A protein has these predicted regions:
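Conserved beta/loop motifs at nucleotide-recognition and modification sites
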Residues: 1-348
Length: 348
């Protein structure tokens, strides 16, 4: 039980530091939403363990729904060729949902694991969920495997990383513009890599401007929904309707749009309460656990255009529509979403 209650799961930095010091584990479980860093860790393992030109013999990649534990065992037990160790990666095998025979095979492998092998279970598309009721498997993994969580990076690390990426492309970017990029494109490095490349290629000058980002970046859902809500608050229904139409053209599910809209409306409500109560941007940032004050500033600015009563009613109506979408059959969800937006624009 003590292992399940540890304060902090090791992340990329701990893994990287250990690898740099020469410490390589035998079994890893990689999980978390920052798949860019997860792949970076796999690349570092490959560079350390697998000699160039011998990947076919010493680096075994396994994946697929039909993958069996027997295949994993065979790959793990395969002897290295012209190298001291082998690397085996297994993608999206849900260890705690294996049948009893497969779990038994995994426990047996972990109990007598070849020292020359490093086995990595990669949770890319599925979440990593343990099950304490499976005591033998839980104990075997606790004894043999290292769990590494690749979580979203903090604001300071992202700022430095974004600047390095742009610098590699011969461009500069200031802190405020980085904040705008993260607000627009999200905070996951995996999604930021292609956006940074696209923006750097588009920008004509040596320094990236917000206009460069707005011109070519693909905003994440939350950013698009904020623009839609901001347009409603500014009484610009045409722009709000255009934002919604664009989301629907992109085949975003109405229920996902409504969920994001509900969150934005709640944030807008608290921003209005902050204004009425004499609270500042930092109060709002801390309340919503935002990484920077940039989105909080945008919310406060938008909230100045609406009344508290409007915010309260908007949140209530959103909750009602959410319940209806989830409970009523054959609902015209797109039509109801458009109608809801019109109602928001019509009541101030």
């Amino acid at each position: 039980m003590a292992k399940e209650k540890k304060e902090k799961t090791p992340g990329y930095e701990e893994f990287h530091d250990a690898l740099q010091s020469g410490t390589v584990g035998n079994v890893y479980i990689f999980h978390g939403e920052e798949t860019y860093l997860m792949q970076q860790a796999v690349t570092e393992l490959q560079a350390r363990l697998v000699p160039a030109g011998f990947e076919e013999f010493n680096y075994h990649r396994l994946a697929g729904k039909g993958l069996t534990m027997q295949e994993v065992v065979e790959a793990a037990e395969a002897m290295p060729m012209m190298a001291e160790r082998t690397l085996v990666t297994v993608e999206d095998m849900d260890l705690f949902r294996l049948d009893e025979a497969q779990r038994g095979a995994l426990v047996a492998l972990l109990g007598d694991f070849p020292e020359y092998c490093t086995l990595v279970f990669l949770y890319r598309q599925i979440p990593y969920k343990t099950d304490a009721k499976l005591k033998k498997l839980t104990a075997a993994l606790a004894e043999r495997a290292q769990v590494i969580e690749f979580a979203q990076q903090g604001q300071q690390k992202l700022q430095k990383w974004v600047r390095r990426r742009f610098a590699a492309a011969g461009k500069e970017i200031d802190a405020v513009t980085v904040d705008h990029l993260l607000f627009t494109c999200g905070s996951l490095m995996t999604g930021l890599v292609p956006e940074i490349a696209k923006i750097a290629a588009y920008a004509r000058g040596p320094k990236i401007a917000m206009a460069d980002i707005d011109a070519v970046a693909d905003p994440v859902l939350d950013a698009r929904v904020f623009d839609m809500t901001d347009a409603v608050a500014a009484r610009d229904y045409d722009k709000a309707a255009e934002c919604l139409a664009e989301l629907l053209r992109m085949q975003e599910e109405p229920i996902r749009i409504l969920a994001a809209l509900g969150k934005t409306l709640r944030q807008l409500y608290t921003a209005r309460l902050a204004i009425d109560g004499g609270k500042d941007v930092l109060w709002l940032k801390d309340l919503w656990r935002m990484k920077s004050d940039y989105p909080a500033k945008k919310l406060m600015q938008s909230a100045r255009g609406v009344r508290r009563s409007w915010c309260r009613e908007a949140v209530k109506r959103c909750q009602t529509l959410d319940h209806r979408m989830k409970s009523e059959r054959n609902m015209d969800s797109e039509g109801e979403l458009k109608l809801f937006l019109m109602e928001l624009a019509g009541v101030k």
